[in-house]
């Protein structure tokens, strides 16, 4: 049995955007029967919130949409940098990951998976200083991009063969 495919989401503090994406994507994969085939993690580029729960507003939006909320913030480390795919929530995160030595082919912007993002900026705006509606907007942006990420996973799993 081969190791599971590893996808990690990266934002600034790992308490808002990346844990939302992680929880949403991981649950969707479990519902598709791929929970053992794909490992989903998240991390922040900074260490300010290491060990903290997700922001209560992020957790509230996840809970309202039926997603789990258990989370402990982490800073990007060796485990995350070794992921098959590192999904950056904004351009600064992508740049930092490349500066840390991650090959450009393994770094993607989350919104690049949403074909409807078109002319919109690829950044997912940080809702930290916003209100509930900003967190709902982040949820909607993530939700729109995840089908494309599922397609990426399906293609990788098909190419790599069954685990």
Swiss-Prot record:
Give the matching InterPro entries. Answer: LMW_PTPase (IPR050438), Ptyr_pPase (IPR023485), Ptyr_pPase_sf (IPR036196), Tyr_phospatase_low_mol_wt (IPR017867)
Q: What does the record say about activity regulation?
A: Phosphatase activity is stimulated by phosphorylation. Inhibited by sodium molybdate, sodium orthovanadate and sodium tungstate. Inhibited by S-nitrosylation. Subjected to substrate activation, triggered by pNPP or by phosphotyrosine. Is also activated by phosphoserine, with serine being ineffective in enhancing PtpA activity.
Effect of inactivating the gene: Deletion mutant is attenuated in human macrophages. The mutant is not defective when grown in vitro and also shows no growth defect in a mouse infection model.
Q: What is its main location?
A: secreted
- Quick one: effect of changing residue 140 to E? No longer binds to ubiquitin. Abolishes the Jnk- and p38-dependent production of TNF and IL-1-beta in macrophages. Also abolishes the PtpA-mediated inhibition of phagosome acidification
Q: What is this protein called?
A: Low molecular weight protein-tyrosine phosphatase A
Q: Which GO terms describe its biological process?
A: symbiont-mediated perturbation of host phagocytosis; symbiont-mediated suppression of host apoptosis; symbiont-mediated suppression of host innate immune response; symbiont-mediated suppression of host phagosome acidification
This entry carries the following GO cellular component terms, namely:
cytosol; extracellular region; host cell cytoplasmic vesicle; host cell nucleus; plasma membrane
Organism, as annotated = Mycobacterium tuberculosis (strain ATCC 25618 / H37Rv)
Q: What result follows from mutating residue 129 to E?
A: Loss of phosphatase activity
Reported EC number(s) for this entry are: 3.1.3.48
**Reported effect, residue 45 to A:** Slight decrease in phosphatase activity
The protein's gene is named ptpA
Phenotype for residue 53 to A: Lack of nitrosylation. Does not affect phosphatase activity
Recorded GO MF terms: protein tyrosine phosphatase activity
Q: Which residues carry this modification: Phosphothreonine?
A: 45
Catalysed reaction, written as an equation: O-phospho-L-tyrosyl-[protein] + H2O = L-tyrosyl-[protein] + phosphate
């Amino acid at each position: 049995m081969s190791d599971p495919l590893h996808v990690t989401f990266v934002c600034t503090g790992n308490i808002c955007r990346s844990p939302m994406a992680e929880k949403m994507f991981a649950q969707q994969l479990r519902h598709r029967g791929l929970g053992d085939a794909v490992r989903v993690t998240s991390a922040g580029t900074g260490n300010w919130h290491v060990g903290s729960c997700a922001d209560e507003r992020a957790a509230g939006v996840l809970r309202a949409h039926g997603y789990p909320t258990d989370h402990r913030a982490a800073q990007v480390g060796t485990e995350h940098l070794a992921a098959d795919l590192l999904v950056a929530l904004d351009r600064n995160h992508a740049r930092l990951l490349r500066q840390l030595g991650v090959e450009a082919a393994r770094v993607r912007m989350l919104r690049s998976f949403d074909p409807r993002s078109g002319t919109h900026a690829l950044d997912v705006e940080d809702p930290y200083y916003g209100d509930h509606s900003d967190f709902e907007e982040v949820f909607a942006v993530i939700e729109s991009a995840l089908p494309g990420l599922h397609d990426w996973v399906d293609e990788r799993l098909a190419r790599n063969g069954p685990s």
